[in-house]
């Protein structure tokens, strides 16, 4: 919403924006939409092709696996597959044109004994497998300073504060996981 006044392209593409206490949806002219859902057990029944799990480490693992990931049940079928040229193709042949659903996880790092660390490790392993399509990256605070999104003097001030926690800073701003994994001592 806040970017629309400065972007002619966004104004051309976005049909309608609805933000109420119980709903947040951005509808596009091409019939696509972005919908925000609360990460709880009541979110059952929705469908999506791309799911962004913001601050995913704060989501209950059972809600993530048993409710939210179920949104990705069916793949998006491009409209051209319904045209005369393609509609006769066997199901197996059509599969190569389907857009695979995507999951995007956003979060700061956290404690290594939390389930989210195991998830990140799994993503790293899968990223190394050439038969899979995974990606992970960390964007530490130095990048924000370089890009002018974070003031370096403000960072220095925060670090000099008597209540500064280097552990929390490392997890939140340096993409560093903290502690030991289960069973380590």
Regions found by a protein language model. Give the residues of each.
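Inter-Walker segment of RecA-like/P-loop motor cores
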Residues: 1-49
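Non-catalytic, compositionally simple segments
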Residues: 9, 62-185
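Generic beta-strand/beta-sheet core signal
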Residues: 29, 37-39, 54, 80, ...
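Glycine-rich nucleotide phosphate-binding loop and flanking beta-alpha elements
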Residues: 42, 59, 112
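Conserved aromatic-histidine-acidic binding/catalytic patches
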Residues: 44, 56, 161
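Extended hydrophobic-aromatic, low-complexity segments
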Residues: 46, 61-62
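Walker B catalytic acidic pair
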Residues: 52-58
């Amino acid at each position: 919403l806040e970017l629309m006044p400065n972007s002619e392209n966004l104004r051309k593409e976005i049909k309608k924006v609805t933000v109420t206490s119980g709903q947040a949806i951005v509808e596009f002219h091409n019939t696509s939409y972005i919908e925000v859902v609360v990460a709880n057990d009541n979110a059952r029944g929705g469908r999506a092709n791309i799911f962004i799990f913001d601050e995913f480490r704060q989501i209950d693992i059972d809600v993530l696996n048993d409710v939210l990931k179920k949104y990705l049940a069916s793949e998006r079928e491009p409209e051209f597959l319904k045209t005369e040229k393609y509609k006769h193709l066997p199901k197996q042949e059509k599969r190569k044109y389907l857009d695979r659903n995507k999951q995007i996880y956003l979060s700061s790092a956290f404690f290594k004994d939390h389930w989210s660390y195991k998830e990140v490790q799994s993503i790293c392993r899968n990223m190394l497998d050439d038969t899979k399509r995974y990606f992970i990256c960390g964007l530490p605070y130095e990048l924000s300073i370089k890009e002018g999104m974070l003031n370096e003097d403000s960072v220095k001030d925060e670090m000099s504060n008597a209540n500064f926690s280097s552990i929390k800073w490392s997890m939140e701003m340096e993409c560093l996981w903290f502690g030991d994994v289960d069973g380590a001592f």
